[in-house]
Amino acid sequence: MAFLLITRRLACSSQKNLHLFIPGSRYISQAAAKVDIEFDYDGPLMKTEVPGPRSKELMKQLNTIQNAEAVHFFCNYEESRGNYLVDVDGNRMLDLYSQISSVPIGYNHPALAKLVQQPQNASTFINRPALGILPPENFVDKLQESLMSVAPRGMSQLITMACGSCSNENAFKTIFMWYRSKERGQRGFSKEELETCMVNQSPGCPDYSILSFMGAFHGRTMGCLATTHSKAIHKIDIPSFDWPIAPFPRLKYPLEEFTTDNQQEEARCLEEVEDLIVKYRKKKRTVAGIIVEPIQSEGGDNHASDDFFRKLRDIARKHGCAFLVDEVQTGGGCTGKFWAHEHWGLDDPADVMTFSKKMMTGGFFHKEEFRPSAPYRIFNTWLGDPSKNLLLAEVINIIKREDLLNNVARVGKTLLTGLLDLQAQYPQFISRVRGRGTFCSFDTPDEAIRNKLILIARNKGVVLGGCGDKSIRFRPTLVFRDHHAHLFLSIFSGILADFK
């Protein structure tokens, strides 16, 4: 019934709200509020502060059964559409955060609503199988239509999961098994290995490690948390492993003015990576793999050059380490290529690549040589969700049909240019503007100013996200257009002009 209601509302989308006033903000012209996708609104519409009274009441109720302090507001997903998120108090906001970068083609896309209503798809949404032992007849076909159609170069193997953390966690396990298999050679498991692994001892449980970078975020499960170094609150009180942590480059901006400094900074970090690999080998805690994000997201939208990643890949190969690229947040098209690591121009592809968020399901691609040697070694009950593969196949069709990767590249230039203009106009509030595609960000003077700007923007009808200590990040959908960027820039310019 909910999807029928959504479809009826989408059919009435031509009845637009033509007056766009945001309390306390400048008037936004109708040209800026142009609608060019059939299921979008024409602009923000604010009725209360956010969170409003209904959200506050629901937050209070939720807090009686769990800690709800992280909740921003409650949403009305039936009324949300396109690039606009509607809350339970009727506030309609331009969403440039898109559920922490996880909404690919906007809210309630008509094609997805239609897909859900088709009778032949009902059983896929009703029945969630244990895919590792009882997959449905069309499972292989749907994987080919969805995930395998966008498989990264050099990776023919795929394992689906439910989220980003379990994707990275199982990718680590895959790397450890691969590395031990190389050491073991052709022989099978020894009696000693089989016995000692049951009591968490060597040689059955070898003391391998994964090298990660300071500022990284790879998830919150035990193995992933050992490679996550973005915020202390994620890690405090949780036992962890002695695994190596390398510095990630801290680039100076504008890039063209600091070429030499940035090259030296990247060289310093790469040298430290090699030193740590050698150090941990001597400690008998061999680095089996290196994990890196194409852009450190939660840690502050930290970038490095394509050359840095090419050299990092060379170091991994030189020392026999697996090279794992975490595309959980950067994957799915938001940098202007389907996978952000495609920008690097690697001669030798990465060994393993994890994904989630905009891909609507989790999992990882890997090279043939990383294939598990026996069943149940990489396994859980669900191993993903076929209904998400069904939706993803249609999302990928829309990305191709509407040329959304080029849209992201084009609109990203509009957004980045506008942010640079605001930086020139308000250098006291904005610095280090950076981005790739619409995956953009900038720094503010401190955390307090950053948080205040995000709250003011929300009450003006724009949802933004924070990251790192003092950065604001942009994570719009792939159907974010030029006029959405201009609309945001107009609103945010007014905020900065009045900011105290």
From Swiss-Prot:
Binding site for [2Fe-2S] cluster: C163, C166
InterPro entries xref list: 4NH2But_aminotransferase_euk, Aminotrans_3, Aminotrans_3_PPA_site, PyrdxlP-dep_Trfase, PyrdxlP-dep_Trfase_major, PyrdxlP-dep_Trfase_small
GO cellular component, one term: mitochondrion
Positions carrying N6-acetyllysine: K252, K279, K318, K413, K452, K470
One Gene Ontology molecular-function label: pyridoxal phosphate binding
Organism superkingdom: Eukaryota
Modified residues (N6-succinyllysine): K231, K252, K413
Presequence boundaries: 1-28
Catalysed conversion reaction: 4-aminobutanoate + 2-oxoglutarate = succinate semialdehyde + L-glutamate; (S)-3-amino-2-methylpropanoate + 2-oxoglutarate = 2-methyl-3-oxopropanoate + L-glutamate
Cofactor or coenzyme needed: pyridoxal 5'-phosphate; [2Fe-2S] cluster
Residues with PTM N6-(pyridoxal phosphate)lysine: K357
Function: Catalyzes the conversion of gamma-aminobutyrate and L-beta-aminoisobutyrate to succinate semialdehyde and methylmalonate semialdehyde, respectively. Can also convert delta-aminovalerate and beta-alanine.
Record protein name field: 4-aminobutyrate aminotransferase, mitochondrial
Species, as recorded: Mus musculus (Mouse)
